A protein has these predicted regions:
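NAD(P)+-binding Rossmann beta1-loop-alpha1 motif at the extreme N-terminus of oxidoreductases
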Residues: 1-62, 101, 121, 151
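Rossmann-fold dinucleotide-binding core
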Residues: 4, 92-168
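Class I S-adenosyl-L-methionine
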Residues: 21, 38-42, 103-107, 141-145, ...
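Amphipathic alpha-helical hairpins
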Residues: 53, 60, 66, 70, ...
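Helical "substrate-binding/catalytic lid" subdomain
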Residues: 159-269
């Protein structure tokens, strides 16, 4: 079994790492907040305080981090320690530009695969994420399949690009549902009546996500993803959506909560 280093044990990373342990892979884990590694250590992983130490003997390195800056910082730490023949699977949502930057920095003999995921914490726990794999994923596809079905997207960076497209549609749909519900509130409609009508129409999936429970995708992460999207193309509607989620992320009670909390924030917002 391949030796795997997993860096980033947040809401998504921790359950994903558990699937690798369950499959029998020797696993070394690292997280900026070291205490989060405790449950995985109890389940059989080895933790380290040094990301370079985590990857030194790894056949496969998986990163699931907050965004481009965190990935660049980790790259500075681990690139000198990656051994020839290793695969780095970057699973964070960082956009194709960051993937291209990393590709230019890869040591000889190291393969970079961009493989962000579709789905939230419930699908991560169940092993039913959708994996969008760009680049030469042949050597790690069987490992990625531990997390859910794998879609090969093409050249390096295409997985990251498609993830940005998917997240833009999801976040935009949730914001549109929030505004539709805000209109229903203003017109005096019962919440259940408006919600059921929207759920039965073309926005049914967005309605389900806007009112989802037991999942997690923070408003701060939504801001990061929309920013990446609007920096890549002129997207006037998403620029308005960015304003909604930036306002939600400015509220300390909402910033790290699931985007369903932002829906409530948007509905109550009086300045937009």
């Amino acid at each position: 079994m391949e030796k795997i280093a997993f860096l980033g044990l947040g809401h998504m990373g921790e359950p994903m790492a558990r699937h690798l342990l369950a499959a029998g892979h020797p696993l070394v884990v690292w997280n900026r907040t070291a205490a989060k590694a405790g449950p995985l250590v109890a389940a059989g992983a080895r933790a380290t305080a040094d990301p370079a130490d985590a990857v030194r003997d790894a056949d496969v390195v998986i990163t699931m981090l907050a965004g481009p800056e965190a990935v660049r910082e980790i790259a500075d730490a681990i690139l000198p320690a990656l051994r020839p023949g290793a695969h780095w699977v970057e699973m964070s949502t960082v956009g194709p530009d960051t993937v291209r930057e990393l590709g230019e920095r890869m040591p000889a003999g190291v393969t970079l695969v961009d493989a962000p995921v579709m789905g939230s914490t419930d699908k991560a726990a169940a092993g039913r994420l959708g994996i969008l794999a760009g680049g030469d994923a042949a050597g790690v596809e069987h490992i990625l399949a531990r997390f859910g079905p794998v879609t090969r997207t093409g050249a390096p960076g295409t997985g990251a690009a498609l993830k940005l497209v998917v997240n833009t549609a999801v976040i935009g749909g949730v914001a549109l549902v929030a505004e539709a519900m805000k209109l229903a509130d203003a017109l005096g409609l019962a919440e259940g009546t408006a919600r059921d009508a929207l759920a039965g129409g073309p926005l049914g999936g967005a309605v389900a996500r806007a009112f989802a429970e037991g999942v997690h995708f923070g408003s701060d992460l939504a801001v990061k993803d929309i920013t990446l999207a609007t920096e890549s193309a002129r997207l006037p509607a998403m620029e308005a959506v960015l304003g909604h989620f930036a306002a939600a992320a400015a509220d300390p009670d909402v910033v790290h909560e699931d985007i369903a909390r932002a829906v409530t924030h948007i509905r109550a917002r009086r300045d937009a």
